């Protein structure tokens, strides 16, 4: 399964009052509005962050990027190729990682880049010590991998303001 990446904004042209070194007047300018489309990854992020900011206006929201991913075979109806392959809608995992980083910039949120700072990559055979089972599940971290993720998260969180 895959979800299209989508767009962050739609653009429209609108009239807006503006002045800079001249008399104020109405001008036509482009205006962007966040896309709230549950059928796209960026739309879902916009929806989720908007809702969290409404429900928890005084809380720090932190985004995490997805981990690297490798082959997983969970049966006849659930086989997931590694990250060298596009998903069913033609996207590589890198596009989803990049979208989370962009969301941090757009929404003013810190991003903890699990894709890089954990140092875990199941595409490298020697790193499979951090993943569940090299035979059929190179996607989910095992206990050792979860401990590494927890330490990464702890130290990254300590670097953020309260």
What are these language model-derived features?
Residues 1-161:
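Alpha-helical cap/lid subdomain in secreted, periplasmic
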